[in-house]
UniProtKB/Swiss-Prot annotation:
Lineage, highest ranks first: Eukaryota, Viridiplantae, Streptophyta, Embryophyta, Tracheophyta
NCBIfam families per UniProt: MIP
Protein name: Probable aquaporin TIP-type alpha
GO molecular function: water channel activity
Native source organism of the sequence: Phaseolus vulgaris (Kidney bean)
Keywords, ordered alphabetically: Membrane, Phosphoprotein, Repeat, Transmembrane, Transmembrane helix, Transport, Vacuole
Main location: membrane
Transmembrane segment boundaries: 25-44, 58-77, 103-121, 144-164, 170-189, 217-239
Amino acid sequence: MATRRYSFGRTDEATHPDSMRASLAEFASTFIFVFAGEGSGLALVKIYQDSAFSAGELLALALAHAFALFAAVSASMHVSGGHVNPAVSFGALIGGRISVIRAVYYWIAQLLGSIVAALVLRLVTNNMRPSGFHVSPGVGVGHMFILEVVMTFGLMYTVYGTAIDPKRGAVSYIAPLAIGLIVGANILVGGPFDGACMNPALAFGPSLVGWQWHQHWIFWVGPLLGAALAALVYEYAVIPIEPPPHHHQPLATEDY
């Protein structure tokens, strides 16, 4: 991962083949993640019909999202960094790890991947409407906003610790697994309340295809804010600042 550097991007970055390859990788990985994650929810609806949401279903959703994200990040990490999430890309931008141009390319690719995944799901499930995300009845909107901020903070902090930190060492080999596990764990926490989104792309595609926009803003503003906070905390409080090099003449022997 590159060192911290805030920039809009080079003039040739918009058309460079590496940018195109990275954007394609983000599109494909986001498609994989949304198809499996949202698809698992539709499958449970098909199996259990109108029965009450159970702990077993929650566990199944958590595992499906964790495994899918593990695979999606693994498949694209060496090409694009394996963001698979506009909030992660935003956090990397706030932390000075990617340029504005690269972030915009990733956002477009991630949203398109989510839309295509939701469209394919609607096609192959005989027109079942993707459910997207919403706040559960009796749960305060403000509380869910804070929950999304906190859960995405944990996700972005994990991304930094395993995939971005220059001194991460061998822990980078388990980055995709760690990222998938934190998402699965957060779904066990937040799933009964608002679905535990943490990813604007995961919310956007199903909401567009299913045309369900109620309280949709929570699943954008909360994750973006949480990722930005985690990036700032890790960049400026956790990653050590290298001291500037000292240029001096060695003391003569008689000066010791």
